[in-house]
């Protein structure tokens, strides 16, 4: 079993609540738009996986990929910043998501927390919303969940305060 702390769209701001809520996590996953210094602080705290977002600079784009496909506890995961969601996948992922669907598809960008199951492709979609102060969202959010033998469980949406 592995416990994951998932966040996105920090835009250079990392709320101290992230460290409290993710204290018992084994890994942190960031779905892009880190902004300055966020990746370093997260990587010092826990093992970090992530993708760059549309506001991330060249340094971040050399450190993190645009798309990250990997396996965690026998769960096929695909993470990208601009990916859309079931029924409205982004053009750059649409073809592959239907031909080689992951069991878990993670995206950010919209600043809207969303957890949806796509029964057409037997895949869970998660967008953790935005954990930073920049953007139009009103509440900063995180997602925390566990993976055991290819299954997601104990998923929680966490509100960490107003923007």
Predicted feature locations:
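N-terminal active-site segment of His-dependent metallophosphoesterases
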Residues: 1-48, 56-74, 79, 138-141, ...
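Active-site glycine-centered loops adjacent to acidic/histidine catalytic or metal-binding residues
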Residues: 9, 33, 53, 81, ...
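Pre-active-site segment of Zn-dependent metallo-hydrolases
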Residues: 13-16, 79, 84-98
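Conserved beta-sheet core of the metallophosphoesterase superfamily
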Residues: 49, 88-151, 155
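Short histidine/acidic/glycine/proline-rich micro-motifs that form metal-
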Residues: 56-57, 83-86, 131-133
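Residue-level recognition of conserved beta-strand positions in structured domain cores
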Residues: 72, 81-82, 147, 156-157
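Short, solvent-exposed aromatic-acidic interface loops
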Residues: 154-163
């Amino acid at each position: 079993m592995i416990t994951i702390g998932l966040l996105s769209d920090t835009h250079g701001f990392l709320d101290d609540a992230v460290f409290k809520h993710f204290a018992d996590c084994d890994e942190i996953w960031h779905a892009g738009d880190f902004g300055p210094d966020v990746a370093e602080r997260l990587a010092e705290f826990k093992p970090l996986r992530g993708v760059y977002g549309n506001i991330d600079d060249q340094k971040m784009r050399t450190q993190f990929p645009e798309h990250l496909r990997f396996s965690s506890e026998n769960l096929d995961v695909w993470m990208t910043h601009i990916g859309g969601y079931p029924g409205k996948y982004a053009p750059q992922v649409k073809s592959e998501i239907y031909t080689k669907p992951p069991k878990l598809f993670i995206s950010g960008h919209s600043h809207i927390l969303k957890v949806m199951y796509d029964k057409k492709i037997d895949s869970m979609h998660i967008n953790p919303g935005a954990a930073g102060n920049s953007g139009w969202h009103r509440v900063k959010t995180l997602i925390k969940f566990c993976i055991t033998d290819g299954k997601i469980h104990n998923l929680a949406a966490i509100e960490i305060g107003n923007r």
